[in-house]
Amino acid sequence: TSVVQRDKVGIGFNNIAYAYDINSKKPYRHIAVIPLDLNGNGKIDPEEDFYATSTELNAAIAEGKYPSPPARNLFLVSNGKPMKPEVLAFLEFILTDGQQYAPEVGYIGLSSDILEEELFKLQE
């Protein structure tokens, strides 16, 4: 981020967490988040203008307004069902209390349907 900030013609491709200040929720100084013209009409319409804060952008991603890609799902993969108690406890944490930390670091929390489905898989 700092290299792009110092280069007036610099361009960077990054995770939201690296473009927005975690405290102010606004883009870092000297960083401009370039919006996407989602409907291709050559301008950013009000319903496409959700880049002022990370809170607005995260909400747009969660609501499906921001496309995939560049927004995308992340998965954890294992070789068979995890059996170790500490691994199961970690996965349960991710799907419960850990969800509260997702927005702070530029991720979108999972929907209640997905959380329920994945927690059920841990119980099987």
Regions found by a protein language model. Give the residues of each.
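Exported/periplasmic ABC-transporter solute-binding proteins
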Residues: 1-124
